[in-house]
Design a protein with these regions (language model features):
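Alpha-helical structural elements of signaling/regulatory helical domains
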Residues: 23-27, 48, 70-73
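Walker B catalytic acidic pair
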Residues: 185-187
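Conserved beta-strand scaffold positions in the cores of enzyme catalytic domains, especially
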Residues: 209, 221-225
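Generic alpha-helical segment signature
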Residues: 7, 32, 49, 53-56
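Conserved NTPase motor "head" modules and their coupling/switch loops across ABC/AAA+ ATPases, GTPases
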Residues: 51-181, 190, 194, 198-206, ...
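Secondary-structure edge/capping motif, primarily at the C-terminal ends of alpha-helices
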Residues: 43-47
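Extended, charged alpha-helical "arm/stalk" segments used for dimerization and assembly
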Residues: 1-42
Length: 230
């Protein structure tokens, strides 16, 4: 499940959706990951080259800044959408909030604060021969009525809110010439009858929706069957 799984799953959710909206974001991620690999190789050296380590750290800080800004903007924009979708699917006015936790807060002194954070983590990095902080270790969380849903939410609540979160980016497409195509893989089996009906009703807002399922029947939908051949 999204909120009970690895933080990497949640970072992937951010990165995939931001890359679709902003191609330059993918460029920043690619540059950051390249420098991260280089820094980790330096840390694994028998004799660490301090100048190379310093240079790679400065580059990580440089590329991390725009990534943090994009992630923070995305989470802020998606929060109200997440609330509306969750309430539509559940029919209950729960208090929902998505939170992004950057490795360092953006401010006018971002570069200085980020470099200081890397300096504080240096002993740990050298000991484990890997970069222990940065945008590659960040996470997002969702709270339901003030409590972390991954920790305190029921299995049903986790499934519904995760589904609502996955649907939210489709509502961020404001260009009328771009009609989003919604693709949902085997989500119906995780929902009870009432919530399946609510979801199907909700999905009729979209021009095209593809749902994979082994036995789902939807009025007015075109069914494409795939069979396994011997």
């Amino acid at each position: 499940m999204l909120f009970r799984g690895s933080p990497k799953e949640r970072r992937n959710f951010l990165d995939i959706n931001l890359s679709k909206q902003f191609p330059i974001y993918l460029d920043y991620i690619s540059r950051y990951e390249k420098v991260l690999r280089q820094r980790n190789e330096i840390l694994k050296s028998e004799k660490v080259d301090q100048k190379l380590l310093e240079a790679s750290t400065e580059l990580l800080v440089k590329y991390a800044g725009p990534i943090i800004n994009y992630r923070a903007m995305f989470v802020k924009d998606i929060n109200d959408i997440l609330i509306k979708i969750t309430r539509t699917l559940t029919g209950v006015k729960e208090k929902i909030e998505i939170t992004y936790r950057p490795f360092v807060n953006m401010s006018s002194d971002y570069q200085k604060e980020a470099l200081e954070a890397f300096k504080r983590s240096l002993d740990n990095d050298l000991r484990h021969k890997a970069t222990s902080i940065g945008i590659h270790r960040e996470d997002i969380s969702v709270s339901l009525n003030g409590k972390d849903i991954g920790t305190f939410g029921s299995q049903g609540e986790n499934r519904l809110v995760a589904l609502a979160l996955k649907l939210s980016p489709y509502f961020m497409i404001t260009d009328e010439d771009k009609k989003p195509i919604v693709v949902l893989d085997d989500v119906m089996s995780e929902l009870d009858k009432d919530h399946r009906e609510q979801l199907i009703k909700f999905l009729r807002k979209f021009a095209q929706v593809f749902i994979t399922d082994t036995k789902l029947e939807i009025d007015g939908a075109t069914r494409i069957e795939l069979t396994k051949s011997n």
